[in-house]
Design a protein with these regions (language model features):
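Short loop/turn microsegments at loop-to-beta-strand junctions
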Residues: 22-24, 341-344
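Short, well-ordered beta-strand elements
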Residues: 345-346, 352-360, 365
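Generic C-terminus detector
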Residues: 362-389
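Active-site SXXK
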Residues: 6-13, 32, 59-85, 161-166, ...
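Short, P/G- and charge-enriched loop/turn segments at secondary-structure junctions
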Residues: 13-15, 57, 147-148, 330-335, ...
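Short, glycine/proline-biased beta-turn/loop segments that scaffold the active-site neighborhood
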Residues: 83-98, 183-185
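Short, conserved catalytic-motif segment at the N-terminal edge
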Residues: 2-60, 81-83, 368, 372
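Short, surface-exposed loop or secondary-structure junction motifs
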Residues: 98-332
Length: 389
């Protein structure tokens, strides 16, 4: 009889052979039980070959948003320290200005604040402490006239939520996460800013070529209006020659440029972990959570953006959203999140199923692969695996 992991492992091995990813680590669980797990391929291709194992630590990228930041915000709301419906300006005085004064915490958490999806904050702020003010200077995206803000997935929303947590507690986000999440759950391989564990960590991109291209495109669009004017400008030379750009393989530090600028600790990215420990954290959003009150769980499982093209709860996207990475095998009520480095978590709250896929698909360079289709296929095989267990 074949091992229950075989169909998923065979699929991922085929993607590794095709060059879609260097390696992967995954876990399929139900009711807190691990049904299937495996590690395949390489965690590091450059500067040497290091195999992926079940203990390999991955850069989770945007999975930081739900697993740390959103969880902490709701925990502090349960204690009365934060009000999810309060304006952001109550906690960050930088936002006590006309066009952003009405933005609320819940709008940040559901990506309905109107903030743009990304900005190279390391080019606009001098220090970590300057980041909220730099975001406050950012123009909001155009919104429909009917009054309800459209969903625009934005790193900036969760960068700000990280600063909200730090302002109200007086502690840095990584220390909050350690005390409030990692220690209570007994997590030993989950952290921000990994210590000297280099050979146990999956590498990511060789330099920041992808982000440099995005920064140039962002500056073109915002500052100049046409490519020719920007190409001849001193600002372009300043962007391209920035000493802050990393040139070598990013290994043992966060891939995201904004999070790296903030010392590896940010509300939108910076978390490192394994599939087993990510599974442990993901279960905190399901019935039986050790960290959240039962009455808070609906905030993570219900659609809080009705009428919008994207259905979102706090932090998570719902599978009812057309063309998301859930795929047709998951029910519309499933919730999930992706990370740019090649990570994802999808959950079926009614069956208490959790599917974790961790890859470093950006290593050694960001390629033109269909990561959405890989995630959808993984989810389908995970459903098949757990249903036949």
């Amino acid at each position: 009889m074949p091992n229950v992991s075989d169909i998923i492992s065979s699929f991922l091995q085929s993607e590794i052979a095709r060059g879609s990813l260097p390696g992967a680590q995954y876990l399929v669980g139900e009711d807190l039980r691990i049904i299937a797990e495996d590690a395949l391929g390489l965690a590091v291709v450059e500067p040497e070959h290091i195999p992926a194992t079940l203990d390999t630590i991955y850069d989770l990228a945007s999975l930081t948003k739900p697993l740390v930041t959103a969880l902490l915000v709701v925990r502090f709301a349960e204690r009365g320290v934060l009000d999810l419906n309060a304006p952001l300006a109550r906690y960050l005085v930088e936002f006590n200005d006309k066009d952003k004064r009405e933005i609320t915490l819940i709008q940040l958490m559901t990506h309905s604040s109107g903030l743009p999806n990304w900005r190279p904050l390391y080019l606009e702020a001098q220090t970590r402490a300057d980041v909220p003010a730099a975001i406050a200077r950012t123009l909001l995206e155009p919104q429909p006239p009917h009054g309800q803000r459209e969903v625009i997935y934005s790193d900036l929303n969760y960068v700000l939520l990280g600063f909200v947590l730090e302002r109200v507690t007086g502690e840095r986000l990584d220390r909050l996460a350690e005390r409030e999440i990692f220690e209570p759950l007994g997590l030993e391989r989950t952290m921000f800013s990994p210590p000297e564990l280099l050979r146990e960590i999956a590498a990511t991109e060789h330099g920041q070529e992808f982000e440099l291209a995005n920064a140039i495109a962002d500056a073109e669009t915002r500052s100049w209006g046409d490519t020719a004017s920007f190409a001849a400008s001193p600002y372009r030379r300043a962007v391209v020659s920035q000493a802050k750009w990393r040139k070598d393989v990013i290994w043992g530090e966060v891939h995201d440029g904004n999070a790296n600028f903030m010392g590896g600790v940010a509300g939108h990215a910076g978390l490192f972990s394994t599939a087993r420990e990510a599974f442990r954290m993901a279960n905190q959003f399901l019935p039986g959570s050790e960290l959240l009150k039962p009455e808070s769980l609906h905030l993570f499982t219900g659609n809080l953006t009705p009428g919008c093209r994207t259905s979102r709860s706090i932090a998570w996207i719902l599978a009812e959203t057309p063309d998301c990475s859930a795929g047709p095998a998951l029910p519309p009520t499933a919730l999930g999140h992706n990370g740019f480095t090649g990570t994802s978590i999808w959950m079926d709250p009614h069956k208490r199923r959790v599917f974790v896929l961790l890859t470093n698909r950006v290593h050694p360079r960001v390629g033109a692969i269909d990561m959405r289709e890989i995630r959808r296929r993984f989810n389908a095989l995970a459903v098949e695996t757990v249903s036949g267990f």
